[in-house]
């Protein structure tokens, strides 16, 4: 069954494994998430658990949000997500989900919002090569040919535009270490997002059985 938790990206560091191998890891701080709602087939048409992360000032929340959080005996949350394919009997409204639900060696999918780079050209956005700088070349950093078909640009053509700031999921990352006393997960490799950005960690959908 699927496990999941919301947290924030602290940054990257490196640790030694038990075999003495140096491994780069991303530090994810995931303070306890509160179960705000348990959705069932009878009431909602599907099964899921709704979790909230990071308290919001009540001044910034509206009455529906306050009432929804009050049912779980907690304050309104800034971030709310749903986790599907869960064992509903393991969750109660108002209970907490902590990093203890994961263990070392678990394979997870990590979702975050990539760092925004604004408007960029083909070379930075798509990693294309630049043209010659001399010998009469007029092709330095421009996109190049638009294709052999006239009067239109083919769909999917790689062109300059907005780079980053998109929701991205990196699959099949391994949890190297769990530090419950600090609410921290150490995940092997890098994950999308800037420091302090929201990160969603859940059980891998395509992990080897």
Curated annotation (Swiss-Prot):
A single GO cellular-component term on record: cytosolic large ribosomal subunit
GO biological process: one example: translation
Entry coiled-coil feature ranges: none
Gene Ontology terms for molecular function: rRNA binding; structural constituent of ribosome
Key words of the record: Ribonucleoprotein, Ribosomal protein, RNA-binding, rRNA-binding
Region named Disordered: 112-146
Transmembrane region(s): none
Function: One of the primary rRNA binding proteins, it binds directly near the 3'-end of the 23S rRNA, where it nucleates assembly of the 50S subunit.
Pfam families according to UniProt: Ribosomal_L3 (PF00297)
Similarity comment: family membership: Belongs to the universal ribosomal protein uL3 family.
This protein's record includes keyword Cell membrane: no
Alphabetized HAMAP family for the sequence: Ribosomal_uL3_B
Gene3D superfamilies linked: 3.30.160.810, Translation factors
Keyword Ubl conjugation carried by entry: no
Subunit structure: Part of the 50S ribosomal subunit. Forms a cluster with proteins L14 and L19.
Name of the featured protein: Large ribosomal subunit protein uL3
Bias kind Polar residues: ranges: 112-122
Gene transcribed to yield this protein: rplC
């Amino acid at each position: 069954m699927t496990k999941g938790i919301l947290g924030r990206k602290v940054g990257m560091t490196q640790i030694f494994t038990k075999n003495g191998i140096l491994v780069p890891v991303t530090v994810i701080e995931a303070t306890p998430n509160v179960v705000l709602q348990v959705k069932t087939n009878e009431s909602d048409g599907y099964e899921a658990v709704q979790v909230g992360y990071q308290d919001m000032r009540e001044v910034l929340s509206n009455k529906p949000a306050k009432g929804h959080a009050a049912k779980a005996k907690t304050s309104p949350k800034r971030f709310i997500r749903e986790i599907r394919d869960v064992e509903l009997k393991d969750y109660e409204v108002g209970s907490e989900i902590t990093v203890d639900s994961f263990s070392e060696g678990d394979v997870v999918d990590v979702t975050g919002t990539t760092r925004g780079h604004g408007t960029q050209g083909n070379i930075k956005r798509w990693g294309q090569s630049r043209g010659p700088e001399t010998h009469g070349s007029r092709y330095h950093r421009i996109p190049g040919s638009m294709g052999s078909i006239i009067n239109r640009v083919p769909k999917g053509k790689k062109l300059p535009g907005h780079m980053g700031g998109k929701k991205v999921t990196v699959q099949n990352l391994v949890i190297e270490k769990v530090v419950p006393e600090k609410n921290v997960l150490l995940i092997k490799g890098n994950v999308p997002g800037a420091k302090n950005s929201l990160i969603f960690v859940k059980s891998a959908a395509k992990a080897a059985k």
